[in-house]
Protein backbone atom coordinates (compact mmCIF):
# COMPACT_ATOMS: atom_id res chain seq x y z
CA UNK A 1 0.00 0.00 0.00
CA UNK A 2 1.50 3.38 -1.06
CA UNK A 3 1.44 5.10 2.34
CA UNK A 4 5.18 5.39 2.89
CA UNK A 5 6.74 8.84 2.70
CA UNK A 6 10.25 8.00 3.88
CA UNK A 7 12.55 5.05 3.27
CA UNK A 8 15.44 3.86 5.39
CA UNK A 9 15.51 2.44 8.91
CA UNK A 10 13.20 4.03 11.46
CA UNK A 11 15.99 4.86 13.92
CA UNK A 12 18.01 6.49 11.15
CA UNK A 13 15.07 8.76 10.34
CA UNK A 14 14.71 9.60 14.02
CA UNK A 15 18.39 10.50 14.35
CA UNK A 16 18.20 12.79 11.32
CA UNK A 17 15.12 14.62 12.60
CA UNK A 18 16.58 15.02 16.07
CA UNK A 19 19.26 17.18 14.43
CA UNK A 20 16.62 19.48 12.89
CA UNK A 21 16.46 22.24 15.50
CA UNK A 22 13.97 24.37 13.58
CA UNK A 23 11.53 21.51 13.15
CA UNK A 24 11.71 20.58 16.81
CA UNK A 25 11.17 24.19 17.85
CA UNK A 26 8.25 24.60 15.45
CA UNK A 27 6.58 21.45 16.72
CA UNK A 28 7.07 22.44 20.36
CA UNK A 29 5.66 25.91 19.71
CA UNK A 30 2.68 24.48 17.84
CA UNK A 31 1.94 22.03 20.64
CA UNK A 32 2.22 24.67 23.37
CA UNK A 33 0.07 27.25 21.59
CA UNK A 34 -2.44 24.64 20.48
CA UNK A 35 -2.83 23.32 24.02
CA UNK A 36 -3.74 26.76 25.34
CA UNK A 37 -6.20 27.49 22.49
CA UNK A 38 -7.85 24.10 22.79
CA UNK A 39 -8.21 24.43 26.55
CA UNK A 40 -9.90 27.80 26.14
CA UNK A 41 -12.56 26.66 23.67
CA UNK A 42 -13.42 23.44 25.48
CA UNK A 43 -13.78 25.30 28.78
CA UNK A 44 -16.05 27.79 27.03
CA UNK A 45 -18.18 24.94 25.67
CA UNK A 46 -18.47 23.30 29.08
CA UNK A 47 -19.22 19.68 30.00
CA UNK A 48 -16.41 18.52 27.73
CA UNK A 49 -16.37 14.93 28.99
CA UNK A 50 -20.08 14.62 28.25
CA UNK A 51 -19.45 15.91 24.73
CA UNK A 52 -16.64 13.36 24.32
CA UNK A 53 -18.94 10.56 25.44
CA UNK A 54 -21.61 11.68 22.99
CA UNK A 55 -19.10 11.85 20.13
CA UNK A 56 -17.81 8.39 21.03
CA UNK A 57 -21.35 6.99 21.01
CA UNK A 58 -22.01 8.51 17.58
CA UNK A 59 -18.85 7.02 16.09
CA UNK A 60 -19.39 3.61 17.71
CA UNK A 61 -22.99 3.43 16.54
CA UNK A 62 -22.02 4.40 13.00
CA UNK A 63 -19.26 1.79 12.78
CA UNK A 64 -21.51 -0.91 14.19
CA UNK A 65 -24.06 -0.12 11.48
CA UNK A 66 -21.63 0.93 8.76
CA UNK A 67 -23.08 -1.25 6.01
CA UNK A 68 -26.53 0.28 6.52
CA UNK A 69 -25.33 3.87 6.49
CA UNK A 70 -23.05 3.37 3.48
CA UNK A 71 -25.96 1.93 1.52
CA UNK A 72 -28.19 4.83 2.59
CA UNK A 73 -25.50 7.31 1.57
CA UNK A 74 -25.04 5.63 -1.81
CA UNK A 75 -28.77 5.62 -2.54
CA UNK A 76 -29.18 9.29 -1.62
CA UNK A 77 -26.17 10.39 -3.69
CA UNK A 78 -27.66 8.56 -6.67
CA UNK A 79 -31.07 10.16 -6.08
CA UNK A 80 -29.41 13.58 -6.33
CA UNK A 81 -27.80 12.69 -9.65
CA UNK A 82 -24.37 11.70 -8.36
CA UNK A 83 -22.28 8.60 -9.03
CA UNK A 84 -20.88 6.34 -6.29
CA UNK A 85 -17.95 3.95 -6.59
CA UNK A 86 -16.87 1.58 -3.82
CA UNK A 87 -13.13 0.95 -4.07
CA UNK A 88 -11.81 -2.11 -2.28
CA UNK A 89 -8.18 -1.10 -2.82
CA UNK A 90 -6.10 1.98 -3.54
CA UNK A 91 -5.55 0.70 -7.07
CA UNK A 92 -9.30 0.45 -7.73
CA UNK A 93 -9.87 4.00 -6.46
CA UNK A 94 -7.03 5.41 -8.54
CA UNK A 95 -8.13 3.54 -11.66
CA UNK A 96 -11.70 4.86 -11.38
CA UNK A 97 -10.53 8.46 -11.00
CA UNK A 98 -8.01 8.01 -13.82
CA UNK A 99 -10.80 6.80 -16.14
CA UNK A 100 -12.88 9.88 -15.35
CA UNK A 101 -9.93 12.15 -16.11
CA UNK A 102 -9.36 10.40 -19.44
CA UNK A 103 -13.05 10.52 -20.31
CA UNK A 104 -13.18 14.26 -19.60
CA UNK A 105 -9.86 14.82 -21.39
CA UNK A 106 -8.80 16.71 -18.29
CA UNK A 107 -5.68 18.83 -18.53
CA UNK A 108 -5.81 20.54 -15.16
CA UNK A 109 -7.11 19.19 -11.85
CA UNK A 110 -7.37 21.21 -8.64
CA UNK A 111 -7.47 19.49 -5.26
CA UNK A 112 -8.34 20.52 -1.74
CA UNK A 113 -6.67 18.87 1.25
CA UNK A 114 -7.30 15.14 1.44
CA UNK A 115 -5.46 12.60 3.57
CA UNK A 116 -7.07 9.66 1.82
CA UNK A 117 -5.79 10.76 -1.61
CA UNK A 118 -2.33 10.98 -0.04
CA UNK A 119 -2.89 7.49 1.35
CA UNK A 120 -3.74 5.99 -2.05
CA UNK A 121 -1.03 8.05 -3.80
CA UNK A 122 -3.46 9.51 -6.34
CA UNK A 123 -1.47 12.43 -7.75
CA UNK A 124 1.24 10.40 -9.56
CA UNK A 125 -1.46 8.31 -11.24
CA UNK A 126 -3.08 11.42 -12.72
CA UNK A 127 0.24 13.03 -13.60
CA UNK A 128 1.21 9.88 -15.49
CA UNK A 129 -1.64 10.48 -17.97
CA UNK A 130 -0.64 14.10 -18.52
CA UNK A 131 -2.83 15.90 -15.98
CA UNK A 132 -1.51 18.97 -14.18
CA UNK A 133 -2.60 18.29 -10.59
CA UNK A 134 -2.56 21.35 -8.32
CA UNK A 135 -2.91 21.20 -4.53
CA UNK A 136 -4.82 24.28 -3.35
CA UNK A 137 -4.46 23.98 0.43
CA UNK A 138 -1.61 26.40 1.10
CA UNK A 139 0.46 23.95 3.13
CA UNK A 140 0.00 21.15 0.61
CA UNK A 141 0.73 23.57 -2.25
CA UNK A 142 4.05 24.58 -0.67
CA UNK A 143 5.06 20.93 -0.28
CA UNK A 144 3.98 20.06 -3.81
CA UNK A 145 6.03 22.75 -5.54
CA UNK A 146 8.98 21.90 -3.28
CA UNK A 147 9.53 18.70 -5.26
CA UNK A 148 6.69 16.85 -3.52
CA UNK A 149 8.05 17.15 0.00
CA UNK A 150 5.83 14.87 2.15
CA UNK A 151 3.53 16.26 4.86
CA UNK A 152 4.67 16.11 8.48
CA UNK A 153 1.38 16.80 10.28
CA UNK A 154 -2.22 15.74 9.65
CA UNK A 155 -3.64 19.27 9.93
CA UNK A 156 -0.56 21.46 9.30
CA UNK A 157 1.32 19.57 6.56
CA UNK A 158 4.11 22.15 6.12
CA UNK A 159 4.78 22.58 9.83
CA UNK A 160 8.44 21.62 9.35
CA UNK A 161 9.19 24.60 7.05
CA UNK A 162 9.97 28.15 8.14
CA UNK A 163 8.99 31.28 6.22
CA UNK A 164 12.48 31.75 4.78
CA UNK A 165 12.44 28.24 3.37
CA UNK A 166 9.00 28.87 1.89
CA UNK A 167 10.20 32.15 0.35
CA UNK A 168 13.12 30.30 -1.26
CA UNK A 169 10.75 27.66 -2.65
CA UNK A 170 8.51 30.37 -4.11
CA UNK A 171 11.56 32.09 -5.61
CA UNK A 172 12.82 28.91 -7.28
CA UNK A 173 9.48 27.64 -8.51
CA UNK A 174 7.29 30.73 -8.96
CA UNK A 175 9.76 33.55 -9.59
CA UNK A 176 8.79 35.26 -6.33
CA UNK A 177 11.13 38.15 -5.41
CA UNK A 178 9.52 39.73 -2.36
CA UNK A 179 9.99 39.28 1.39
CA UNK A 180 9.36 36.28 3.63
CA UNK A 181 6.39 38.04 5.23
CA UNK A 182 3.64 35.38 5.52
CA UNK A 183 1.01 37.82 4.27
CA UNK A 184 3.01 38.50 1.09
CA UNK A 185 3.67 34.80 0.59
CA UNK A 186 -0.01 33.94 0.99
CA UNK A 187 -1.04 36.72 -1.40
CA UNK A 188 1.35 35.46 -4.08
CA UNK A 189 0.09 31.90 -3.69
CA UNK A 190 -3.52 33.08 -3.89
CA UNK A 191 -2.89 35.02 -7.10
CA UNK A 192 -1.14 32.04 -8.66
CA UNK A 193 -3.83 29.57 -7.64
CA UNK A 194 -6.67 31.77 -8.86
CA UNK A 195 -5.68 31.05 -12.47
CA UNK A 196 -5.69 27.34 -11.74
CA UNK A 197 -9.21 27.42 -10.33
CA UNK A 198 -10.53 29.19 -13.40
CA UNK A 199 -8.96 26.77 -15.88
CA UNK A 200 -9.46 23.46 -14.04
CA UNK A 201 -11.45 20.67 -15.65
CA UNK A 202 -11.90 18.56 -12.51
CA UNK A 203 -11.99 19.36 -8.80
CA UNK A 204 -11.06 16.70 -6.24
CA UNK A 205 -11.80 16.96 -2.52
CA UNK A 206 -11.60 14.84 0.56
CA UNK A 207 -14.51 14.54 2.95
CA UNK A 208 -14.65 15.32 6.65
CA UNK A 209 -18.06 13.72 7.07
CA UNK A 210 -20.55 12.28 4.59
CA UNK A 211 -24.17 12.52 5.72
CA UNK A 212 -26.12 9.34 5.03
CA UNK A 213 -29.64 10.80 5.31
CA UNK A 214 -29.11 13.33 2.50
CA UNK A 215 -26.18 12.06 0.44
CA UNK A 216 -24.23 15.21 1.33
CA UNK A 217 -20.54 15.73 2.03
CA UNK A 218 -19.09 18.13 4.59
CA UNK A 219 -15.84 20.04 4.13
CA UNK A 220 -14.22 21.88 7.05
CA UNK A 221 -11.55 24.43 6.09
CA UNK A 222 -10.03 27.77 7.08
CA UNK A 223 -8.86 28.87 3.63
CA UNK A 224 -11.97 28.59 1.47
CA UNK A 225 -10.08 26.74 -1.24
CA UNK A 226 -12.43 23.75 -1.06
CA UNK A 227 -15.37 25.98 -1.99
CA UNK A 228 -13.59 27.05 -5.18
CA UNK A 229 -12.54 23.48 -5.97
CA UNK A 230 -16.17 22.37 -5.77
CA UNK A 231 -17.76 25.41 -7.43
CA UNK A 232 -15.77 26.15 -10.59
CA UNK A 233 -14.73 22.90 -12.34
CA UNK A 234 -17.44 21.08 -14.28
CA UNK A 235 -16.65 17.73 -12.66
CA UNK A 236 -16.22 17.11 -8.94
CA UNK A 237 -14.78 13.97 -7.38
CA UNK A 238 -14.92 13.45 -3.63
CA UNK A 239 -12.74 10.72 -2.13
CA UNK A 240 -13.54 9.46 1.37
CA UNK A 241 -12.50 6.66 3.69
CA UNK A 242 -15.46 4.35 4.21
CA UNK A 243 -15.64 5.22 7.92
CA UNK A 244 -15.99 9.00 7.41
CA UNK A 245 -19.78 8.99 7.62
CA UNK A 246 -22.51 10.11 10.02
CA UNK A 247 -26.21 9.18 10.04
CA UNK A 248 -27.77 12.67 10.03
CA UNK A 249 -27.02 16.39 10.17
CA UNK A 250 -27.52 16.27 13.94
CA UNK A 251 -24.52 13.98 14.43
CA UNK A 252 -22.50 15.98 11.91
CA UNK A 253 -22.99 19.15 13.95
CA UNK A 254 -21.69 17.45 17.11
CA UNK A 255 -18.61 16.01 15.40
CA UNK A 256 -17.75 19.22 13.54
CA UNK A 257 -17.88 21.08 16.85
CA UNK A 258 -15.50 18.52 18.37
CA UNK A 259 -13.25 18.56 15.29
CA UNK A 260 -12.70 22.30 15.11
CA UNK A 261 -12.05 22.68 18.83
CA UNK A 262 -9.66 19.73 18.94
CA UNK A 263 -7.82 20.43 15.69
CA UNK A 264 -7.24 24.18 15.70
CA UNK A 265 -8.67 25.48 18.98
CA UNK A 266 -11.57 27.30 17.30
CA UNK A 267 -15.29 27.16 17.97
CA UNK A 268 -15.75 26.90 14.21
CA UNK A 269 -13.46 27.14 11.22
CA UNK A 270 -13.92 29.90 8.65
CA UNK A 271 -15.71 27.63 6.19
CA UNK A 272 -17.98 24.66 6.83
CA UNK A 273 -19.39 23.60 3.49
CA UNK A 274 -22.12 21.04 2.87
CA UNK A 275 -22.50 19.86 -0.74
CA UNK A 276 -25.20 17.61 -2.13
CA UNK A 277 -24.78 16.18 -5.61
CA UNK A 278 -24.22 18.03 -8.89
CA UNK A 279 -25.60 21.42 -9.86
CA UNK A 280 -29.37 21.55 -10.18
CA UNK A 281 -31.43 23.76 -12.46
CA UNK A 282 -31.32 27.32 -11.18
CA UNK A 283 -28.06 26.92 -9.25
CA UNK A 284 -25.54 29.68 -9.89
CA UNK A 285 -22.50 27.42 -9.59
CA UNK A 286 -21.39 23.92 -8.75
CA UNK A 287 -20.27 20.92 -10.80
CA UNK A 288 -22.27 19.46 -13.64
CA UNK A 289 -21.14 15.99 -12.61
CA UNK A 290 -20.42 14.57 -9.15
CA UNK A 291 -18.59 11.36 -8.22
CA UNK A 292 -18.17 9.95 -4.71
CA UNK A 293 -15.36 7.41 -4.32
CA UNK A 294 -15.64 5.43 -1.07
CA UNK A 295 -12.32 3.81 -0.19
CA UNK A 296 -11.86 0.65 1.87
CA UNK A 297 -8.12 -0.01 1.46
CA UNK A 298 -7.86 -2.24 4.51
CA UNK A 299 -10.47 -0.59 6.72
CA UNK A 300 -12.98 -3.44 6.52
CA UNK A 301 -10.35 -5.81 7.91
CA UNK A 302 -10.18 -3.63 11.04
CA UNK A 303 -13.93 -3.82 11.67
CA UNK A 304 -14.85 -6.40 14.28
CA UNK A 305 -11.33 -6.57 15.72
CA UNK A 306 -9.84 -5.14 18.90
CA UNK A 307 -8.58 -2.26 16.74
CA UNK A 308 -12.03 -1.13 15.54
CA UNK A 309 -11.99 1.97 17.80
CA UNK A 310 -9.24 3.48 15.63
CA UNK A 311 -11.86 3.92 12.88
CA UNK A 312 -13.66 6.38 15.17
CA UNK A 313 -10.90 8.88 14.32
CA UNK A 314 -12.05 12.24 12.92
CA UNK A 315 -8.50 13.34 11.89
CA UNK A 316 -8.27 16.24 14.33
CA UNK A 317 -4.63 15.48 15.30
CA UNK A 318 -5.29 16.33 18.95
CA UNK A 319 -3.27 13.25 19.87
CA UNK A 320 -0.37 14.43 17.70
CA UNK A 321 -0.47 17.83 19.34
CA UNK A 322 0.17 16.47 22.83
CA UNK A 323 2.51 13.57 22.05
CA UNK A 324 5.95 13.96 23.69
CA UNK A 325 7.54 11.61 21.15
CA UNK A 326 6.18 13.53 18.15
CA UNK A 327 7.38 16.73 19.85
CA UNK A 328 10.99 15.57 19.52
CA UNK A 329 11.08 13.49 16.32
CA UNK A 330 8.48 15.24 14.11
CA UNK A 331 6.22 13.70 11.50
CA UNK A 332 8.71 12.48 8.90
CA UNK A 333 10.30 10.06 11.36
CA UNK A 334 7.17 7.92 11.22
CA UNK A 335 7.66 7.19 7.53
CA UNK A 336 3.90 7.32 6.95
CA UNK A 337 1.44 10.03 5.98
CA UNK A 338 -0.25 9.28 9.31
CA UNK A 339 2.08 10.38 12.11
CA UNK A 340 1.86 10.69 15.87
CA UNK A 341 -0.11 8.29 18.07
CA UNK A 342 -2.92 7.83 15.54
CA UNK A 343 -0.35 7.03 12.86
CA UNK A 344 1.44 4.60 15.15
CA UNK A 345 -1.83 2.69 15.55
CA UNK A 346 -3.27 3.07 12.05
CA UNK A 347 -0.21 2.66 9.81
CA UNK A 348 0.56 -0.96 10.82
CA UNK A 349 -3.10 -1.85 10.26
CA UNK A 350 -3.28 -0.35 6.77
CA UNK A 351 0.31 -0.84 5.67
CA UNK A 352 1.40 -3.95 7.56
CA UNK A 353 3.95 -4.70 10.25
CA UNK A 354 6.81 -5.24 7.82
CA UNK A 355 6.99 -1.50 7.10
CA UNK A 356 5.66 -0.10 10.37
CA UNK A 357 6.60 -2.50 13.17
CA UNK A 358 8.66 0.18 14.97
CA UNK A 359 5.83 2.72 15.24
CA UNK A 360 3.97 1.17 18.21
CA UNK A 361 7.21 1.51 20.15
CA UNK A 362 7.48 5.23 19.32
CA UNK A 363 5.46 6.05 22.41
CA UNK A 364 6.05 6.66 26.10
CA UNK A 365 2.59 5.17 26.82
CA UNK A 366 1.83 8.26 28.90
CA UNK A 367 -1.80 8.14 27.65
CA UNK A 368 -1.94 11.89 26.93
CA UNK A 369 -3.24 10.98 23.46
CA UNK A 370 -6.12 8.98 24.92
CA UNK A 371 -7.01 11.77 27.34
CA UNK A 372 -7.39 14.42 24.62
CA UNK A 373 -9.03 12.30 21.91
CA UNK A 374 -12.48 13.86 21.29
CA UNK A 375 -13.98 10.47 20.37
CA UNK A 376 -12.28 8.52 23.18
CA UNK A 377 -10.07 6.18 21.16
CA UNK A 378 -7.93 4.25 23.71
CA UNK A 379 -4.79 4.92 21.70
CA UNK A 380 -2.21 3.89 24.30
CA UNK A 381 -4.03 0.58 24.86
CA UNK A 382 -4.05 -0.10 21.11
CA UNK A 383 -0.32 0.60 20.97
CA UNK A 384 0.23 -2.02 23.66
CA UNK A 385 -1.94 -4.46 21.70
CA UNK A 386 0.23 -3.85 18.62
CA UNK A 387 3.36 -4.61 20.65
CA UNK A 388 1.81 -7.85 21.85
CA UNK A 389 0.97 -8.90 18.29
CA UNK A 390 4.41 -7.95 16.99
CA UNK A 391 6.04 -10.25 19.55
CA UNK A 392 3.54 -13.11 19.83
CA UNK A 393 1.98 -13.43 16.37
CA UNK A 394 4.35 -11.77 13.96
CA UNK A 395 7.59 -12.81 15.61
CA UNK A 396 9.08 -9.43 14.70
CA UNK A 397 10.66 -8.57 18.06
CA UNK A 398 14.27 -7.32 17.77
CA UNK A 399 16.90 -10.06 17.82
CA UNK A 400 18.52 -8.67 20.97
CA UNK A 401 15.18 -8.69 22.76
CA UNK A 402 14.50 -12.29 21.69
CA UNK A 403 17.92 -13.43 22.94
CA UNK A 404 17.52 -11.55 26.22
CA UNK A 405 14.11 -13.07 26.86
CA UNK A 406 15.39 -16.55 25.97
CA UNK A 407 18.32 -16.18 28.37
CA UNK A 408 16.01 -14.90 31.10
CA UNK A 409 13.64 -17.82 30.58
CA UNK A 410 16.45 -20.37 30.76
CA UNK A 411 18.00 -18.73 33.80
CA UNK A 412 14.81 -18.47 35.82
CA UNK A 413 13.69 -22.01 34.92
CA UNK A 414 16.82 -23.56 36.43
CA UNK A 415 17.61 -22.92 40.14
CA UNK A 416 21.28 -23.71 39.66
CA UNK A 417 21.62 -21.36 36.67
CA UNK A 418 19.71 -18.66 38.53
CA UNK A 419 22.04 -18.90 41.56
CA UNK A 420 25.08 -18.83 39.28
CA UNK A 421 23.76 -15.84 37.34
CA UNK A 422 22.96 -13.77 40.43
CA UNK A 423 26.43 -14.44 41.81
CA UNK A 424 28.11 -13.52 38.53
CA UNK A 425 26.04 -10.40 37.73
CA UNK A 426 27.73 -7.87 40.09
CA UNK A 427 31.22 -8.59 38.79
CA UNK A 428 30.03 -8.89 35.16
CA UNK A 429 28.45 -5.41 35.24
CA UNK A 430 31.10 -3.77 37.43
CA UNK A 431 33.04 -2.28 34.45
CA UNK A 432 29.88 -0.47 33.32
CA UNK A 433 28.72 0.74 36.75
CA UNK A 434 29.31 3.93 38.69
CA UNK A 435 27.86 4.80 42.11
CA UNK A 436 25.52 1.84 42.00
CA UNK A 437 24.22 2.64 38.51
CA UNK A 438 25.01 1.23 35.09
CA UNK A 439 25.96 4.34 33.12
CA UNK A 440 27.42 2.80 29.97
CA UNK A 441 25.43 -0.33 29.35
CA UNK A 442 26.70 -2.93 26.90
CA UNK A 443 24.82 -3.99 23.77
CA UNK A 444 21.06 -3.39 23.95
CA UNK A 445 21.45 -1.53 27.27
CA UNK A 446 23.55 1.20 25.64
CA UNK A 447 20.65 3.29 24.32
CA UNK A 448 18.67 2.80 27.52
CA UNK A 449 21.47 3.87 29.89
CA UNK A 450 22.30 6.95 27.84
CA UNK A 451 19.13 8.60 29.10
CA UNK A 452 17.78 6.44 31.95
CA UNK A 453 18.96 5.15 35.31
CA UNK A 454 19.63 1.41 35.35
CA UNK A 455 20.58 0.12 38.82
CA UNK A 456 23.62 -2.14 39.03
CA UNK A 457 23.14 -5.66 40.46
CA UNK A 458 23.58 -5.68 44.24
CA UNK A 459 26.62 -7.46 45.62
CA UNK A 460 24.41 -9.19 48.17
CA UNK A 461 21.70 -11.42 46.77
CA UNK A 462 18.24 -11.27 48.33
CA UNK A 463 18.41 -14.87 49.57
CA UNK A 464 21.73 -14.12 51.33
CA UNK A 465 20.32 -10.94 52.83
CA UNK A 466 17.25 -12.78 54.05
CA UNK A 467 19.33 -15.63 55.52
CA UNK A 468 21.51 -13.15 57.44
CA UNK A 469 18.44 -11.35 58.72
CA UNK A 470 16.95 -14.60 59.98
CA UNK A 471 20.18 -15.26 61.86
CA UNK A 472 20.01 -11.85 63.48
CA UNK A 473 22.55 -10.20 61.21
CA UNK A 474 22.52 -6.64 59.93
CA UNK A 475 19.29 -6.28 57.84
CA UNK A 476 20.71 -3.39 55.83
UniProtKB/Swiss-Prot annotation:
InterPro entries: 4Fe4S_Fe-S-bd, 4Fe4S_Fe_S_CS, FTHF_cligase-like_sf, Helical_ferredxn, LUD_dom, LutB, LutB/LldF, LutB_C. Residues 304-334, 353-382 form the 4Fe-4S ferredoxin-type domain. [4Fe-4S] cluster 1 binds at residues 313, 316, 319, 373. It comes from the Bacteria. GO terms for biological process: lactate metabolic process. [4Fe-4S] cluster 2 binds at residues 323, 366, 369. Is involved in L-lactate degradation and allows cells to grow with lactate as the sole carbon source. Has probably a role as an electron transporter during oxidation of L-lactate. Belongs to the LutB/YkgF family. This is Lactate utilization protein B. It comes from Geobacillus thermodenitrificans (strain NG80-2).
Amino acid sequence: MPMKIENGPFWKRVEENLQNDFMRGAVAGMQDRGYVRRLGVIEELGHWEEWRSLAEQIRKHTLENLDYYLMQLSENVAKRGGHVFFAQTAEEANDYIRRIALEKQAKKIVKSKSMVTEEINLNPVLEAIGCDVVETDLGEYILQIDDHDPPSHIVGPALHKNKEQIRDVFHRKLGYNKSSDPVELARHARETLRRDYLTADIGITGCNFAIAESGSITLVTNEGNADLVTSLPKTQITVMGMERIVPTFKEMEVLVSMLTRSAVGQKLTSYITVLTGPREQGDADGPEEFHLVIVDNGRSSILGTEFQPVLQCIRCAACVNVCPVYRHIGGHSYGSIYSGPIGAVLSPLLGGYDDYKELPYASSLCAACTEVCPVKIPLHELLIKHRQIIVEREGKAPVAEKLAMKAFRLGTASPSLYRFGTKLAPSAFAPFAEDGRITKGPGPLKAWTESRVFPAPNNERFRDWFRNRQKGGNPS
